From Swiss-Prot:
Family named by the database record: Belongs to the major facilitator (TC 2.A.1) superfamily. Organic cation transporter (TC 2.A.1.19) family.
Membrane topology reported for the UniProt record: Multi-pass membrane protein
GO molecular function, one term: symporter activity
Keywords assigned by UniProt, alphabetized: Cell membrane, Ion transport, Membrane, Symport, Transmembrane, Transmembrane helix, Transport
Observed effect of gene inactivation: Deficient mice show decreased hepatic triglyceride content under refeeding conditions following fasting.
Protein name: Solute carrier family 22 member 18
């Protein structure tokens, strides 16, 4: 097959990311019903979610190094094959003749290698100029929004019409198709020849070289940005992890109403990350956008501390989505610019591990805060944490740190 042009590879990468995220949210939409069918209580379901988060957390940085060393084709193919294995085990767990609970927990194991979004980010980073990078990475938000909307919609509709196995079977077929497209259409590597030939003078580092991963994280231009990403986004991440419970208990929403709210969230994410951030990045420096996301986080936190109905939350949601999208896109762009082109995959793998970290801590820490203090505590924590981060960014700008590091 003839090699695709650069723009064709970028478009294919967006399509592959949208397919994988749609399948992922199809899985999320049926997982609570499947676990209930298999007799799992809420505690066991929490263990299932935590297992998924821990495996993604551990696998992210290692997968990033694999992508740097083996190339985009191998990384995307491996991610889709791992996803296919997960959905196949999920299909098997639906069968009454098989040990469903064991297979359901076993289906979490391949998730350690399911990192299509970081692999797609690496491809986009390698194929775009630094000035174009925020807008190009922002367009992946369209893929995420498509995944939320169509994945949730297809999962619920197919589950109701054809049974709980149907979404898992469809996801298995689609991810197999994604693996075939990755293997046949994506180039072996998207990095420049000079970057590929750089490590030939010495021994090739191992994919599991934790020292190299740690060294990358501790670079002077990397660690401050990474800490801002983790600390600023953690309070809202805890709220979103607990949102399914909050929507039932605090907002008193039915399942269908909660689905509409998530669709609204997905549409906002598509619009803001796909259309707004790219335009803002051409007019404002990245550090100004980062400060604005932290400031809006603080304002939204104040609103969350005072809200009493779902209508109030709907008014706050655009600000929340803007902050989340801007924080993720801008920090990813800054982190990839802070490392050499040969390390972008590892860096994006580290960055992608932030969300699994929140998913791992969220059920325990978020549940404790919610039971002890109620919904307003999430707003108070978000307000105080982001005001502190904003103060630090104001006193010690990241650009000054970068200049000193050079």
């Amino acid at each position: 097959m003839a090699a695709l042009p650069r723009q064709g590879i970028i478009i294919l990468t967006y399509v592959l990311a949208a397919l994988e995220l749609t399948c992922l949210f199809m899985q999320f939409s049926i997982l609570p019903y499947l676990s209930r069918t298999l007799g799992l209580d809420s505690v066991s379901f929490g263990y299932l979610q935590t297992t998924f988060g821990v495996l993604q957390l551990l696998g992210g940085p290692v997968f990033g190094r694999f992508a740097d060393q083996c190339g985009a084709r191998a990384a995307l193919s491996l991610s889709f094959l791992a996803a296919s294995a997960l959905y196949l085990l999920l299909v098997a767990s639906c069968s009454p003749a098989l040990p469903g609970v064991f297979l359901l927990f076993a289906s979490r194991i391949p998730s350690a290698l399911m990192h299509t979004l970081p692999a797609a980010q690496m491809v986009i980073t390698d194929l775009t100029a630094p000035t174009e990078r925020p807008a190009a990475l922002g367009r992946l938000g369209l893929c995420f929004g498509i995944g939320i909307i169509f994945g949730s919609l297809l999962g619920g509709t197919l589950n109701t019409a054809y049974g709980i196995q149907c979404p898992a079977i469809l996801a298995f077929v689609v991810t197999l198709l994604g693996a075939v497209l990755s293997f046949t259409c994506v180039p072996a590597t998207t990095k420049e020849a000079s970057v590929q030939s750089a490590p030939q003078g010495g021994t090739k580092a191992s994919v599991f070289d934790l020292k190299a991963i740690t060294r990358l994280l501790l670079l002077p231009r990397v660690l401050p940005v990474f800490l801002v990403k983790v600390i600023s986004g953690l309070p809202s991440g805890l709220f979103l992890v607990m949102f399914s419970i909050i929507s039932m208990d605090f907002f008193q929403l039915e399942a269908a109403q909660a689905g509409y709210l998530m669709s609204f969230f997905g549409i906002l994410q598509m619009m803001i990350q796909g259309l707004v951030i790219g335009r803002l990045s051409t007019h404002f420096p990245e550090e100004a956008l980062l400060r604005s996301s932290v400031l809006v986080f603080a304002v939204v936190g104040l609103g969350m501390a005072l809200m009493s109905s779902v209508l109030h939350f709907c008014f706050l949601m655009p600000g929340l989505v803007f902050s989340l999208c801007t924080l993720n896109v801008v920090t990813d762009s800054m982190l990839t610019k802070a490392v050499s082109a040969s390390d972008t995959g590892t860096m994006l793998g580290l960055s992608a591990s932030v969300q699994p970290l929140t998913r791992t801590l969220g059920p325990t820490l978020g549940g404790l805060l919610y039971r002890s203090y109620g919904v307003p505590i999430f707003g108070h924590v978000q307000l105080m944490v982001n005001l502190l981060v904003l103060l630090v960014l104001w006193k010690k700008p990241l650009s000054q740190k970068g200049e000193k590091a050079r």
